[in-house]
């Protein structure tokens, strides 16, 4: 009996030893939380580029508000540079003259009124198809200034203009001597000076006079003296501001009153 007890005890101890030496069960890790994947891919919208606003450097708004004169330039067509008529803007004429004034506004309007007669019913005028006779010598009074602006629009140039080169086989491409000044000063008073425009393909002819003496504000000796002070930089800020207003009001007057009777006289010649 005692022997059986010892055998039982030995077996019990051996079982306990084996149990103690057995490796502990590995911990079961919990499954990681599922990551939600959006069914629709996020749409990234690219910012729409914003066009910068055109900034005008002109401080006198009327300069850019004058309607353009549409013209056909035959040279543009044969060189493949445009597909149709091109606008000619008053602001470009101002750049050419170096300033805007009653005279530049008058030259622009003289040309506009002449072309409306020569090319009626919405017909687009053609550069190089117009001959202009100036009312005086190019260095007399402001005749040359008027002529420069008229040339810019019509293409009619004095002897300094393009002679056409190989393209001169078609008179449209000749610009030289289509603006003719008198050889000697005429001495005419400005309101009596008549610019004669001739359409070369039809022979239609129109004259335009510009009665600039009715422009207001009126020029005075005091205004002339102030102009000298402005040019010398001697005018006070208040004087300069007043002179600027006076000067540009005269140009505005031309555009705003161009259809007043007696301001621009248009004569159609048969």
PLM ranges: what are they?
Residues 6-13:
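Sec-dependent N-terminal signal peptides
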Residues 1-5:
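Positively charged n-region of N-terminal signal peptides that target proteins for export
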Residues 45-98, 109-270:
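Non-transmembrane, aqueous-exposed alpha-helical and coiled segments at domain scale
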Residues 22-24:
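Bacterial signal peptide processing site
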Residues 15-20:
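C-terminal motif of bacterial Sec signal peptides marking the signal peptidase cleavage site
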Residues 28-50:
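Post-signal peptide N-terminal segment of mature Sec-exported envelope proteins
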């Amino acid at each position: 009996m005692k022997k059986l007890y010892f055998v039982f005890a030995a077996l019990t101890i051996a079982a306990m030893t084996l149990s103690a030496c057995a490796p502990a069960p590995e911990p079961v890790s919990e499954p990681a939380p599922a990551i939600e994947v959006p069914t629709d891919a996020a749409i990234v919208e690219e910012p729409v580029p914003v066009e910068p606003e055109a900034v005008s450097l002109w401080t006198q708004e009327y300069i850019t508000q004058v309607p353009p004169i549409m013209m056909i330039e035959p040279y543009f067509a044969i060189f493949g540079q445009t597909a149709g008529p091109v606008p000619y803007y008053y602001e470009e004429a101002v750049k050419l003259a170096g300033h805007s004034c009653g005279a530049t506004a008058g030259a622009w309007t003289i040309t506009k009124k002449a072309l409306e007669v020569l090319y009626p019913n919405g017909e687009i005028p053609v550069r190089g198809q117009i001959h202009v006779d100036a009312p005086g010598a190019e260095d007399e009074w402001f005749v040359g200034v008027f002529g420069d602006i008229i040339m810019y629009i019509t293409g009619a140039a004095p002897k300094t203009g393009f002679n056409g080169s190989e393209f001169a086989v078609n008179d449209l491409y000749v610009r030289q001597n289509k603006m003719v000044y008198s050889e000697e000063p005429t001495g005419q008073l400005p309101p009596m000076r008549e610019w004669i425009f001739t359409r070369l393909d039809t022979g239609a002819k129109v004259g335009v006079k510009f009665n600039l003496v009715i422009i207001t504000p009126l020029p005075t000796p005091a205004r002339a003296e102030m102009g000298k002070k402005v040019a010398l930089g001697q005018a006070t800020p208040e004087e300069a501001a007043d002179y600027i207003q006076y000067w540009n009001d005269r140009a505005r007057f031309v555009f705003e009153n161009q259809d007043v009777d007696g301001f621009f006289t248009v004569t159609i010649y048969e």
